[in-house]
Swiss-Prot record:
SUPFAM superfamilies xrefs: Ribosomal protein L6
GO BP annotations, alphabetical order: cytoplasmic translation
The entry's keywords: Ribonucleoprotein, Ribosomal protein, RNA-binding, rRNA-binding
Entry function: This protein binds to the 23S rRNA, and is important in its secondary structure. It is located near the subunit interface in the base of the L7/L12 stalk, and near the tRNA binding site of the peptidyltransferase center.
Molecular-function annotations in GO: rRNA binding; structural constituent of ribosome
InterPro entries linked: Ribosomal_uL6-like, Ribosomal_uL6-like_a/b-dom_sf, Ribosomal_uL6_a/b-dom, Ribosomal_uL6_bac-type, Ribosomal_uL6_CS
Name of the protein described by the UniProt record: Large ribosomal subunit protein uL6
GO cellular component terms, A-Z: cytosolic large ribosomal subunit
UniProt source species: Chromohalobacter salexigens (strain ATCC BAA-138 / DSM 3043 / CIP 106854 / NCIMB 13768 / 1H11)
Region entry Disordered, spans: 153-176
Pfam families assigned: Ribosomal_L6
Sequence similarity: Belongs to the universal ribosomal protein uL6 family.
Ranges of biased composition (kind: Basic and acidic residues): 153-170
Quaternary context: Part of the 50S ribosomal subunit.
């Protein structure tokens, strides 16, 4: 049984929640996000917080816990937003953000242009650091994974694109 679902989601000031049938819409300072709620979950709104209750089926507690976690991420996203940083290691590897396009020089014979989706912004404080910001946590992680996939870090020299908090396990080179 999920213990996550037993705790309500507190709504910070400036966040509006609208429930219609099985669609939840949350509006805040960072934007508006919506999600469809599973049929086994009922959401109640009272005194600045959301509560979650399961239906009668045995497996509905799992969906209640999942739904509560997703709603918590949406509320945090529209009130504070999420950031994810990427670091680029390698000689001549660099990034430059211009508008909604990210230009990457990653050792290929051509520069890589990545068009950022709606709702995600990128900054490059240094030419080896990319800071991504979004209200949608899932979309932010997907964009970061797609950028990292252009040149994932390799274990011998550590060259490539890695997440800011990622530790790359290094291997020793072959000895003669």
């Amino acid at each position: 049984m999920s213990r996550v679902a037993k705790y309500p989601v507190k709504l910070p000031s400036g966040v509006e929640v609208k429930l219609e049938a099985n669609k939840l819409t949350v509006k805040g300072g960072q934007g508006t996000l919506s999600m469809t709620v599973h049929s086994d979950v009922t959401i109640g709104q009272e005194e600045g917080q959301l509560t979650f209750n399961p239906s009668e089926s045995a497996k509905s507690w799992a969906m209640v816990g999942t739904t509560r976690a997703l709603v918590q991420n949406i509320v945090t996203g529209v009130s504070e937003g999420f950031t994810k940083s990427l670091e680029i290691n390698g000689v001549g590897y660099r990034a430059q953000a211009s508008g909604n396009t990210l230009n990457l020089t990653l050792g290929f014979s051509h520069p890589v242009e990545y068009k950022l989706p709606e709702g995600v912004t990128a900054e490059t404080p240094k030419n080896t650091t990319i800071v991504l910001k979004s209200a949608d946590k899932q979309q932010l992680g997907q964009v970061a994974a797609e950028i990292r996939a252009f040149r994932p870090p390799e274990p011998y020299k550590g060259k490539g694109i890695r997440y800011g908090d990622e530790e790359v396990r290094r291997k020793e080179a072959k000895k003669k």
